[in-house]
Amino acid sequence: MYAALRLLTISGVFALSIWGCSTARPDGPFDPGTVPPTPDYSKLDNWAAHPDKADAADRTPCPEAVDWQKTAQADVFFLYPTSYYGRGTRSKTWNAAVDDPKVNTRTDSASILYQATIFNGAGRVFAPRYRQAHLQAFFTKDKESAEKALTVAYSDVLAAFDYYLKYWNNGRPFVVVGHSQGSVHAMNLIRERIEGTPLHSKLIAAYLVGWPVKRDFFRVVKPCESPTETGCFCTWRTWE
C-alpha cells in the first residue's frame, strides 16, 4: 500500500532542511503496545474541522470574504499534512495521539488555518484528527516500522470517512483534499473506497497536493483537464 514512500527522496531532502535539526526519532522499532487509543469520530473533539463546531477552518482573510459552510451544497474531506515531529516525551512513538495538544496546535494554526480555510466558501469542511505517522516514517531505514505507522494512520482516515458518509454526508457531492502525508492517505482512500463505486459520481474533484501521483495509480480517476471536469484529480509540487 505504501510503496509510494520510495518516491519521496527529493522531497525528503527538502523537509529535512526545515525540520532536520529539531526532529526527534521514535524510540526503537514500531511497537503495537505504544500505539495511542483509536479515535471515536462521533466526538467533535476528534475533528480538527467540522461544520458543527467553531474551528480554524471557519476563518476568512478579510471582512469581504464569507464562510458559506452553513448553506453550502457540497462537502470537503480534508486530510492535513504531517505535524508530528520535534522533541518531547510524546514524540517518541511512531504515531501521534489525537489529543496531543502540541501536535493539534501545529495542525490548527498552520494547515487548518491556511489551507482548509480556502474551501469554506464552497463546502462544509470536515478534517479528522488521525494518528498520523511520525515525520521520520518518511526517512527512516526501518521501512517495516514506517509502513506499520502509516497503516495505523490510514485506518483512522478510513474510519473517519466511513463515519462521515454514514452520519453527515446524506448523498451530498464532496471534494477530497490532502497535503503531503494527507495526500498519501487520500490517494489510498480514493482508490479503495471511491473509484469504481457509486461514490465516484459524487466526487467533485480530489486535490492531492505535495505528493507524486503515478500515472497508473488509479484505475478510473484521471487528472483534471478542464475547470468544469468532475470526478478527477489535481496534483502539484508544493516546493521548488
Residue ranges with predicted function:
Residues Q69-A74:
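Proline/glycine-enriched tight loop/beta-turn segments at coil->beta junctions
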Residues S22-T23, D156-G171, R191-E240:
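Surface cap/lid and interfacial helix-loop subdomains adjacent to catalytic sites
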Residues G178, G182, A186:
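Gly/Ala-rich beta-loop-alpha elbow adjacent to hydrolase catalytic centers
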Residues L8-S17:
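Bacterial N-terminal signal peptides
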Residues C21-V66, T105:
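Basic, amphipathic N-terminal segments that precede the first structured/catalytic domain
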Residues D75-L79, F126-R129, V175-V176, A205-L208, ...:
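Structural recognition of the beta-strand scaffold that forms the well-ordered cores
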Residues G28-Y41, F78-R172:
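Active-site catalytic motif of lipid deacylating hydrolases and related acyltransferases
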Residues M1-T9:
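Bacterial N-terminal signal peptides that target proteins for export
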